[in-house]
Amino acid sequence: MNPNQKILCTSATAITIGAIAALIGIANLGLNIGLHLKPGCNCSHSQPETTNTSQTIINNYYNETNITNIQMEERKSRNFNNLTKGLCTINSWHIYGKDNAVRIGESSDVLVTREPYVSCDPDECRFYALSQGTTIRGKHSNGTIHDRSQYRALISWPLSSPPTVYNSRVECIGWSSTSCNDGKSRMSICISGPNNNASAVVWYNRRPVAEINTWARNILRTQESECVCHNGVCPVVFTDGPATGPADTRIYYFKEGKILKWESLTGTAKHIEECSCYGERTGITCTCRDNWQGSNRPVIQIDPVAMTHTSQYICSPVLTDSPRPNDPNIGKCNDPYPGNNNNGVKGFSYLDGANTWLGRTISTASRSGYEMLKVPNALTDDRSKPIQGQTIVLNADWSGYSGSFMDYWAEGDCYRACFYVELIRGRPKEDKVWWTSNSIVSMCSSTEFLGQWNWPDGAKIEYFL
């Protein structure tokens, strides 16, 4: 083929390709015009696709707004919880929650906490604790053995998950706390400040409502577990004064975070700290810590309707504080049983006549092991003894604070008793690490006679070195 023929051939090919492209373009144009001008369309809209998209977004906005309004109406329609039921029969305890926080914290960003508890809303139950404003692996964890600092806050997080920066919700700022839901919303109280000038801020529905100033200028403090409400009235026990001598305890009565009244401690209890409370049959029972003299636990019984109370000690000779002497043959109902040497640990009990259970560390000298003992009529019988028991944590494993809680919104004709145990790790007992933190195990009652198992923290301290 000579050069002229090559040029002609190339030109013909180009013309053919161009013609095909033009035909495709014309076909596309015709198709689009046909689609846009189909019968029944509103031809005044020059950009119907854009208009349809906008309408969809507007409709979604309306739907989301309606859902939000429905949720708000549901909250408004909720009523105050009333303590109308009694306790369910307790024959044993089943596992309810465990967060394995220290084990997971060996390789993840888990927050340093202590003084944990569990508390329920109508929709869910959550873990609570006082964080230290740092993670277990963080350098600021050095020194977290100290109870009171500007970096502590009451946080909550999903049941059985470890507390992290990502899943925790700050309820209020402070180094001592309590929190409870009245059926309509949650009240949280945090105490902060220096030892001689601390104050409490009362939050309701996530807003600050009231404040309480120190009255004895000696470490104003409160329950370190949930409070309980009846018909909107939520009593809370506060103490201000020496941990090893006469202190000034008051019971405050709140409604929607506002103070209705307060009264000084009455009855025969001599020293009150860190009360663990539960409610049933319109009454509230709080089992507390006598850090001054008693190895037996003081009890405050509160009438939230009359807004009055009385106090005594658990009569049973089964002593439940730690440290403590060996159990005597006869207990004391109105006086502390000596032997705890100006020390103690937060604890709890369910005092329900023949259905009574007491919790305590297995060790009489330290915070290790944990057991539940069925002691009928322990509140009133100074010779009552255990007839049944269940080990929760073996004595070879560390324990700590413990407290009561209940899901008052669960279905059924009785309240299921529940409790948690703090599993402390790190200092002071394990001083190869610089931090002090904990995990949580929680149990609830069963009418069945279930088997028992050991529920330790499970972290190996050598993995942190």
Report each predicted region and the residues it spans.
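Extracellular secreted precursors and ectodomains with disulfide-bonded cysteine-rich loops/domains
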Residues: P39-C41, G86, V118, D123, ...
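Repeated scaffold domains used in trafficking and secretory/extracellular systems
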Residues: S108-Y117, I173-S179, G183-I189, N218-E226, ...
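Entry beta-strands of beta-propeller and related beta-repeat scaffolds
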Residues: E124-A129, S185-M187, A198-A200, V233-V236, ...
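Beta-propeller blade signature
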Residues: R152-P158, I251
